[in-house]
Amino acid sequence: MSGQAEGSTNTEEVPRFRYTAQTAAEIEQRWQRRWEELGTFHAPNPAGSLKGEVSDEKLFVQDMFPYPSGSGLHVGHPLGFIGTDVYARFNRMLGKNVLHTMGFDSFGLPAEQYAVQTGTHPRTTTEKNIERYLTQIRRLGLGHDERRRVATTDIPFYRWTQWIFLQIFHSWYDTDADRARPISELEAQFAAGERATPDGRPWAELSRTEQRRIIDSYRLVYLSEAPVNWAPGLGTVVANEEVTADGLTERGNFPVFRRNLKQWMMRITAYADRLIDDLDRLDWPDKIKTMQRNWIGRSQGANVVFPLDGSAGSIEVFTTRPDTLFGVTYLVLAPEHPLVDELTAAQWPQDPDLRWTGGAATPAEAVAQYRRAASMKSDLDRQENKEKTGVFTGAWATNPVNGEQVPVFIADYVLMGYGTGAIMAVPGEDQRDFDFAEAFGLPVVRTVQPSEGFEGGAYSGEGPRINSANPDVGLDLNGMHLDEAKKTIIEWLESHKHGSGTVQYKLRDWLFARQRYWGEPFPVVYDSDGIPLGLPESELPVVLPEVADYSPRTFDPEDADSRPEPPLAKATEWANVELDLGDGLKNYERDTNVMPQWAGSCWYQLRYIDPDNDQAFVDPANERYWMGKRPELHGPDDPGGLDLYIGGVEHGVLHLLYSRFWHKVLYDLGHVSSEEPYRRLYNQGYIQAYAYTDSRGVYVPAEEVEERDGKFFFQGEEVRREYGKMGKSLKNSVSPDEMADAYGADTLRLYEMAMGPLDASRPWATKDVVGSHRFLQRLWRNVVDENTGELRVTDDEPAIEVLRALHKTIAGVREDYRELRFNTAVAKLIELNNLLTKEYSATGAPRAVVGPLVLMVAPLAPHMAEELWSKLGHDGSLAHGPFPEADEQYLVEDTVEYPIQFNGKVRSRIVVPASAGQDEVKAAALADEKVVAALDGREPRKVIVVPGRLVNVVG
């Protein structure tokens, strides 16, 4: 299923100077060497080792950096890379100082798993893979400033990842100031008595351990004994985001269990409001903003207190619908809720409903069995599970608005991380509650009047409140609609001390530890009291030790009771260390977890700015220049950040949310001037491909499949075609090297940009690549004589219609490049080149048109453009421009074409002078022979002229 470059098989049959794959290869290698020698894409900084003369006009454009896998790139990977390069090259030609580089997100599980299997150090594998990627990327002619390249696994890089971790560790969130502050300021407040301790004792009377416990409860990084996702088969915990809907790990498909473990957490929830509110300040796709808003899940509602019967205790519930309190018929706690053990009754009540007991002899037995089953499900699985399960705890609570007793259940569809880990169930208005009530025989009370025609079940629509009054407590919501009812019930709850209005979030704090080897070590040690201490900057970097075994201890994938044993714990000489942390030499124990793969990607754009700085993670002057706020360009609410960030929509929540969080902490602490890392975000689409399976369902090599009469065959057997991702496992992967060998890198670049809008997915078709190659050949022929190699251009004045076409193309292509519409830019360039071929094939095209055309092609096909620009007599590179500007006088049309509609159908077209008035246009339309024939001697009933657009004749 492949195409063949024109004239690339038998060089004896083609002219000597034709643009072939071989010609392209020679040109591309020559210009890539020259760019490297001249430092063509080096972007100067205002300060530091890369200091140079900087322009006020700058552009910082960045790709989401790749993980260097062992399989290398396929043609789908460079789509975004080429797109950013085209945009960067265009802006560089406009005279801007453009920072564009590429790094590698190189920590990760695949290299570690390969190390476990082969004994090869992950660094060896990673560096080999990076070199392969670089070879492929360089061949594409991407204009990167390679001085700025980083990899997250480089020790000088992760030294600063560790440093940033310590800045966050040594910070707390001041809710009054609404920003992070150094932890030392919090300690000073306690010491001065400006902030009270939890039990009211003076700070000086507390022991060191008590003081640390209080301080640590405020930190933005803290240790927590909390429910985590434990994957015994991997030997590590994983974040919620790394668990599939099936309750398995994203990598390896291992079962995941919920269990309590002590883990590092980052208090991202402190930034929930700012992370939501500042989305309005960003030039991002609405889809990504919605994804982040939904992930954070800000909900306004109320906390309601339900007293427990026979106890002084109570259950606090968060609800977004306090107006439905009269419809509460039971409560549900998350299985992990700390109150469960306390409130679980010793015995069942007399004659319990067997649906409530789970077949257990006592509530405690039922709860224990259910908790174990729930621990084997992921949060996503628990939320999406359609079969409602649960058990009665034997406890009852009182509904504060009507005094009704309601049973208390535990059920896995309630999660500990959202709200209070407890819900009030209103089966009349919530489908999950309704399904649970039906399964357990619980009553349903409606509190909202359903609309006419409602057929039963839970009613989630709007309507007046019903069944919602209790005169004994002075509360009547009946007849009210939502907003009024919510306001009234919250006021009642607050005045009667039964609850309060509040805001809750779905977002939970970020689990920030992995039991792996190949990751950033934590810059933390534990003293003899088990207190975690951040290392001083002089002790950085904490370098990964050499170990004999790279794997964490793994367990039977179903062994939910196992506990993590990280591989770094095996490096005992490294883990047990003697240090002087200011109070003499003492023995400490290093933290043996590593950071998640997300850590390096949270801040790498800042290191691109200042990659050689060994005194700071970034010089403030360089950060201000490249990422600082520019209200004069972007409006008064500009948060700053790099100018364009391109990557896949799959990173819409995790990477982007984590990176925004880290950046905001750095901003609060005064380390950066920008409030956001990415001012503008653009999601490129995907290149997809056909894959083929035989009768066994086994994938067969796509390039060996033949098409005959609309059917597909592999080695004579008919195969089934499917459309989707491109990848090695699907045997439909196409290497960019293969395409560059067959056509040249410029052809591949042009084809990928011409396939469709950059933000849309599109099918790969090798047979169509030759079309882009032929365009470049035709462009070459308009400049170079294929037989002699001589220039074909003339110094003749272009015809006026050619000048109009040229300047119309310049105006359109400039706009297309500016708006990332590269496919339409290609179409305009092809159209102009075709005009030159048509008008000047015999004589040669005018230099005044050829030169601008070559410059316009340069961002897309830079190697060929450089070669043609050189042949046109220019000494330097065109990489820094100038990009052509349109002359307005040629954009004004002398004539206007009007389509003529007769009774609603287009029957003809007329061309009139652009200066023609409506009467002249009307007369010309009525004189058109097709209109005359359609009227057949009749007078038209109406003639409507829409200036510049159409004439509508009603006969």
Swiss-Prot record:
Residue positions binding ATP: 728
SUPFAM superfamilies linked: Anticodon-binding domain of a subclass of class I aminoacyl-tRNA synthetases, Nucleotidylyl transferase, ValRS/IleRS/LeuRS editing domain
Pfam families: Anticodon_1 (PF08264), tRNA-synt_1_2 (PF13603), tRNA-synt_1g (PF09334)
Subcellular location: Cytoplasm
InterPro entries: Leu-tRNA-ligase (IPR002302), Leu_tRNA-synth_edit (IPR025709), M/V/L/I-tRNA-synth_anticd-bd (IPR013155), Methionyl/Leucyl_tRNA_Synth (IPR015413), Rossmann-like_a/b/a_fold (IPR014729), tRNAsynth_Ia_anticodon-bd (IPR009080), Val/Leu/Ile-tRNA-synth_edit (IPR009008)
Keywords attached to this entry: Aminoacyl-tRNA synthetase, ATP-binding, Cytoplasm, Ligase, Nucleotide-binding, Protein biosynthesis
Highest taxon in the source lineage: Bacteria
Any GO molecular function: leucine-tRNA ligase activity
Motif 'HIGH' region: where in chain: 66-77
GO cellular component, one term: cytosol
Placement of sequence motif 'KMSKS' region: 725-729
Keyword rRNA processing among record annotations: no
GO biological process: leucyl-tRNA aminoacylation
Predominant location category: cytoplasm
Enzyme Commission number(s) from the entry: 6.1.1.4
Catalyses which reaction(s): tRNA(Leu) + L-leucine + ATP = L-leucyl-tRNA(Leu) + AMP + diphosphate
Xref: NCBIfam families: leuS_bact (TIGR00396)
Family indicated by similarity: Belongs to the class-I aminoacyl-tRNA synthetase family.
Protein name (Swiss-Prot/TrEMBL): Leucine--tRNA ligase
